[in-house]
Amino acid sequence: MLMRKMLLSVCLLLLAAATGFAQTFTEWQDPQVNSINRLPMQSTFRADESQIVPLGGEWHFNWVRSANQRPVDFWRTDYVEKAWSRMNIPGLWELNGYGDPVYVNAGYPWSGRHKNTPPVPPTENNHVGSYRKYIQIPAEWKGQQMIIHFGSVTSCIYLWVNGKFVGYSEDSKLECEFDLTEFLQPGKRNLIAFQIFRWCDGTYLEDQDFFRFSGLARENFIYTRPLKHINDVSITPDLDATYRDGTLTVNATVSDYRKTRVEMRLYDAEGQEVADPVNAVGSFVVGRFFVKNPHKWSAEDPYLYRLDVRLYEGKKCLQTLHFNTGFRKVEIKGSDLLVNGKRILIKGVNRHELDPDGGYVLSYERMEQDIQRMKQLNINAVRTCHYPDDPYWYELCDRYGLYMVAEANIESHGMGYGAATLARDTAYLQAHLDRNQRHVQRNFNHPSIIIWSLGNEAGYGPSFEAAYDLVRALDPSRPIQYERAEYDGKTDIFCPMYASQEYTKKYSADPSKTKPLIQCEYAHAMGNSQGGFKEYWDLIRTLPKLQGGFIWDFADQSIHWRNSRGKSYYAYAGDFNRSDSGADQNFCDNGILGPDRQFNPHAYEVQYFYQDIWSSLVAPGQVEIYNERFFRDLSDVELRWELLRNGDLQASGTLEDVNVAPQGRRVVEIPYGDVDNSAEWLLNLSYCLDDDEGLLPEDFVVARQQIALSEFNWTMKPLKSAARPKIRNSVAHQFTVSGPNFEIDFSVDDGSMIRYQVGGVNLLKSGETIRPNFWRAPTDNDFGASSQTKMAFWRKPKLEYYSLSQFDKNKLQVIVIEYRISGSDARVQMEYRINDQGAMEVTERLIPGTDRELPDLFRFGVQIPMPKSFENLEFYGRGPFENYQDRCSASFLGKWSQTVSEQFYPYIRPQETGNHTDIRWLRITDQRGKGFEFQAEEPFSASVLHYSIETLDDGDFKHNRHSELLKEDDVTNLLLDYKQMGLGCINSWSELPLPEHRLPFGEYRFHFSIRPL
């Protein structure tokens, strides 16, 4: 303990040493000067409105492209800014016409134009913004301390007031405050002038994977407080060894304790005082509250107490501070992370602080929406990637219940992890310590924070070892993690990135590994993704040491932009100017939500596997309910059930009492009646809130499951014929199979079906054919694994016409066409069996040769381009949203009526979309109800779009294309598949889907039927 206190004292002295220098105007290039005259960080609290002068609104603004062009005397009171423009604060330059947005994944925003020369950033293209405004300060503020607060400045700020230099600060994701008492004149208009640099030495520590904007974000204001005031308050909750009774330790520092006393009072959520008040005198006071069996805080039950801290001088109350707090205990025992003694599961997500319109400027409403979306998706934890967030975010996490990994604003990814890493650069030691120390001090009091993170992707070295020791000294009550410490470095939790399912399984089985494994980033959700998410959670739920992880990431980061024709779209790297190389393109779009917080299709799979209630059939009419919650029973939900027979509703009901204790199980009776194996019987279960809860409304479905009740193998209807269809050579180079109401034409030249008309309705678009298909428009994960080139053989393989045979069997006309695949001796065979009503069975075969091994297939099936008039879609399969073989658990079997136009999901970059799996039958009709039904001998996959594969396919390389700017093709493009390769989600730059979800080259057979309606 003594060594810890000594270390803390030395570190704080080191950090304080850089705050008192006079300005040299080289601070923006000096990593050992992170501030001048900046006030020490304090825990977050909100002043009364009467004590605040907002700084938001329009300011005089000057912008220059390079740092050596900046005005140097603009802060003077006699300076004339007539030629200046206007800029609102908060506001970002690039979103207001000053410079262009830049998105970079790993590497600095000057990459490709300037070399990395830390600590000095480039001068060229280092934009500088200068601001001026006169602010009226209330006369009644005279005799009080006046402080200016900048919520978030990117990247650094120089400040003047009334023509005098005040101070300097860097660290773009923590507020900076300066004492203006000596500079302001209450009752008068005061000139506030400041200058912001796009880049400074601190930018080398801010190489996060997001859009790089410049300017001011968050709240900016001037506030006042008494000259005698409380400087800071820190609150540490704890529970006893049995996790029953609680202690709350409160430390407070006072600016001038002479003739003053500090009073502390603790209240529950109903406003009742729960412990004796504490009164103390001194510059540093400690209060302790002992509460018998307090209501504990957890993400499931975020119960908050209110702590009031008041400063008195005699009987006069000088200042009152209010804090929300919660009783909870975080610890690591053995290989387990515990909250309140329970081995919780981290159902987490990474969240960047980004809005498609405001960039770093987020409204309170947007933050509340983000919380609501997380709750809707059963997310219980969030990592503040990769910097501290707006203070309101922590308040919301406390209030609504989210476990938080709070991360410091350090990422130097662009310097690599080797000898050049800034983690080994002694010049940057102080900055590493400063950013971690201020981060912890500012956010210390939030019960939602259960883990501190020292930074992200910034190498490993002495700076992080010192930062770990500093944070441990500041806060012994929480674990600390850092991904680049890997396993053997200073990290309490092993928190890798993008470890595969197999890796986590091996880690769990390794007796030498004793730390809990919680991935700080996993299940990379770029584009059409999240395949294999089930396999992660099958392991997490069953194996020791595995406790979950944080999906990368929450929302696509593209911003609203307009093209030259005024059309709005979601923009990403490469969209903004010619010098924007766009190498990272849409790598900013990895969200389970879209930029406007709409659910991407893969969000539903996350929602499903993150749910807390699970069901299993234990006997006919008996379902066991498992409550995966750790702290709450199920008294807040009711169970609604539906019985389906072959997709049709047969019965339904509600069970109001399904209460199960935390981590408990209970069997309930569901009176759905008798079922047999002559049909497919399914039981749908939905657990719904019986009242409003937080941001979720009454009746919201918090968990759902579908249980198969019968053993039924779906097969297609047999094809029968009362008479043999006719066959004739209708014109040159084609022959026709016909009956009383249909004609089907085949080409003699290549055997392809070129017309299929029944009752005047054409299945095929004019000039099109039914053709074998092995390709899909590559997904972002496909591009990441280079599948678009490795599997390019199957994009448009040349099928060399080999043979055609025709015969009749059982009154069916049988046409068999065989093709050789150019470049191999593999063959494709298409067999058509046609009855007297124009219905047919189709058998597609892939027959491998012996001469060479071919790459995996994206899919095995057929493509049927239909006239665009076919718009209505009905199917019995998995829906309602798109699904794939490795992302289908959240999509329940049922009958779904939709339109073809609804099938296309506008991923930020166009790609494969619209698939449905486990289809029993599929019907496509026009407005008259005329059309066709498709079945197969076993459940199949299909998609129906008004886009061809070619329209959605970028080719061998990605291009800057956008779904909003695509034009529909004049087609209804039907893809029927025996199977399609899965999507994967391990990462989006190298990994394929899991082996069981691939289609290795080999022998395949797809047998399906087409029937006119």
What do the PLM-derived regions correspond to, one by one?
Residues 23-47, 89-92, 201-204, 210, ...:
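Extended substrate-binding grooves/exosites of carbohydrate-active enzymes
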Residues 27-30, 40, 62-64, 92, ...:
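Accessory beta-strand-rich segments of carbohydrate-active enzymes
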Residues 185-187, 251-331, 676-677, 681-723:
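Extended acidic/polar, glycine-enriched regions
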Residues 23-149, 200, 204-208, 213-216, ...:
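Extended carbohydrate-recognition surfaces in non-catalytic/accessory domains of CAZymes
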Residues 24-34, 42-46, 166-167, 186-224, ...:
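Glycine/proline-rich low-complexity spacer/linker segments in large multi-domain proteins
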Residues 24, 100, 107-121, 170-172, ...:
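An acidic-aromatic loop/edge-strand motif
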Residues 95, 104, 152, 198, ...:
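Beta-strand/loop-rich accessory regions of lumenal/periplasmic or secreted enzymes
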